[in-house]
């Protein structure tokens, strides 16, 4: 039997969402591992690959890491991979106000999972994107920037959407669908 995949996260809500999206049919067990990984700067693909290799070195086995970006088109992709710090300093209201001087409120939610089976292994990336707009905060404020991101074609923010609906359309869902497909192909 294949070893479990260590998902590096300290965020219980993220783990819950990943397990809900992958479902019981996913062929590998996912276990949460909290590691102290360096906070890297750069492009998302590079950040994910380096974080994944460092996590695999520490775990000494199969790992996956996730990095999420919120890219404002008017700001040429910022805050991007630095959304965590923007949110910490500005809160949801501040994220919305960043675009006060811009007509363009469009954004992309981007999720990238990186997987490797060993410290010296190839890192495989699985990326999902959802288009939307940055709006005044609405809905519960218990999961990051969900209150300010309204996906295109919906009149509710991620925070307002029922969890099952969000999990069918989100950037994380799109990335995990690619990851699940990879493991389904691998198990054939």
Swiss-Prot record:
- Location (main, coarse): cytoplasm
What is this protein's record name? Inosine triphosphate pyrophosphatase
**What is written in the cofactor note of this entry?**
Binds 1 divalent metal cation per subunit; can use either Mg(2+) or Mn(2+).
Q: Which family does the record claim for this protein?
A: Belongs to the HAM1 NTPase family.
- What is this protein for, i.e. what is its function? Pyrophosphatase that hydrolyzes non-canonical purine nucleotides such as inosine triphosphate (ITP), deoxyinosine triphosphate (dITP) or xanthosine 5'-triphosphate (XTP) to their respective monophosphate derivatives. The enzyme does not distinguish between the deoxy- and ribose forms. Probably excludes non-canonical purines from RNA and DNA precursor pools, thus preventing their incorporation into RNA and DNA and avoiding chromosomal lesions.
Coiled coil start-end = none
Query: Is this entry keyworded Amino-acid biosynthesis?
Result: no
CC terms in the record's Gene Ontology section:
cytoplasm
Annotated positions binding ITP: 9-14, 51, 67-68, 84, 143-146, 166, 171-172
> GO molecular-function annotation terms?
dITP diphosphatase activity; ITP diphosphatase activity; metal ion binding; nucleoside triphosphate diphosphatase activity; nucleotide binding; XTP diphosphatase activity
Biological processes annotated in GO: deoxyribonucleoside triphosphate catabolic process; nucleoside triphosphate catabolic process; nucleotide metabolic process
**EC annotation?**
3.6.1.66
Which cofactors does this protein require? Mg(2+); Mn(2+)
